[in-house]
Amino acid sequence: MKNLIAELLFKLAQKEEESKELCAQVEALEIIVTAMLRNMAQNDQQRLIDQVEGALYEVKPDASIPDDDTELLRDYVKKLLRHPRQ
């Protein structure tokens, strides 16, 4: 029983570490996208936003991915492009 608990705690710690790594990657990408957008001319910024939103619109939904997840992704991309970090 102790071994099982120890193994579960170890797996939980691994998952937490993976989660932290993913969060750091997302934060880094947000910073990069924000910096790029801020350094672009307004018309170039708008062209990029239109291209990204167009690409997202053209992607066919995957039946294995819940609609809520797809909508969450689209909302987050829109927020990142239209209202970058301060």
UniProtKB/Swiss-Prot annotation:
Residues annotated as transmembrane: none
Keyword Cytoplasm among record annotations: yes
Alphabetical GO biological process terms: cellular response to starvation
Keywords: Coiled coil, Cytoplasm, Stress response
Entry's localization field: Cytoplasm
Gene Ontology annotations for the cellular component aspect, listed alphabetically: cytoplasm
Coiled coil residues, start to end: 1-36
Paired cysteines (S-S): none
Cited Pfam families: Anti-adapt_IraP (PF10796)
Oligomeric and partner information: Interacts with RssB.
NCBIfam families associated with the record: PRK10244.1
Family label: Belongs to the IraP family.
Job description of the protein: Inhibits RpoS proteolysis by regulating RssB activity, thereby increasing the stability of the sigma stress factor RpoS especially during phosphate starvation, but also in stationary phase and during nitrogen starvation. Its effect on RpoS stability is due to its interaction with RssB, which probably blocks the interaction of RssB with RpoS, and the consequent delivery of the RssB-RpoS complex to the ClpXP protein degradation pathway.
Full protein name: Anti-adapter protein IraP
Organism: Escherichia coli O1:K1 / APEC
